[in-house]
From Swiss-Prot:
Light-harvesting photosynthetic bile pigment-protein from the phycobiliprotein complex. Allophycocyanin has a maximum absorption at approximately 650 nanometers. It comes from Anabaena cylindrica. It comes from the Bacteria. This is Allophycocyanin alpha chain. The keyword Iron-sulfur does not apply. Contains one covalently linked phycocyanobilin chromophore.
Length: 160
């Protein structure tokens, strides 16, 4: 988080936090309530977000759920939705921390290679994450949607 980074940097230089670092921490702390509110809305609506995003993805990419597609059949469709749920969870971690580090460290590193080795079209997974962003936007205020959207966009960008 911003707090941890500022402290680690200051300590490495054996100094107190600078006025700029303190201002960034103040802004981070002040935004904490909204970040928690956003994460709570996403968490409470996770099943709805994942299901609607999956429906949008499968409608846009019927090849994924057609015979021979990576999400063909009930079990594989459930696996696809499980993956979307995983990325939604990572997004909430990023929102709460106010930083993309948890997204990077927990589960985005190597994702392209993993899906490529499985023969999964990464653009479809990224499309599912983008669809979750759109569904989430319907549950949040414009300001909260913008905050959350940057984390969804980060995940999508990491997949491209």
């Amino acid at each position: 988080s911003i707090v941890t980074k500022a402290i680690v940097n200051a300590d490495a230089e054996a100094r107190y936090l600078s006025p700029g670092e303190l201002d960034r921490i103040k802004s981070f702390v002040a935004g904490g309530a909204s970040r928690l509110r956003i994460a709570q809305v996403l968490t409470e609506n996770r099943e709805r977000i994942v299901k609607q995003a999956g429906d949008q993805l499968f409608q846009k990419r019927p090849d994924v759920v057609s015979p021979g597609g990576n999400a063909y059949g009930q079990e594989m469709t459930a696996t696809c939705l499980r993956d979307l749920d995983y990325y939604l969870r990572l997004v909430t971690y990023g929102i709460v921390s106010g930083d993309v580090t948890p997204i990077e460290e927990i589960g985005i590193v190597g994702v392209r290679e993993m899906y490529k080795s499985l023969g999964t079209p990464i653009d479809a997974v990224a499309g599912g994450v983008a669809a979750m962003k759109n569904v989430a936007a319907t549950l949040l205020s414009a300001e909260d949607s913008s905050e959350a959207g940057s984390y969804f966009d980060y995940v999508v960008g990491a997949m491209q």
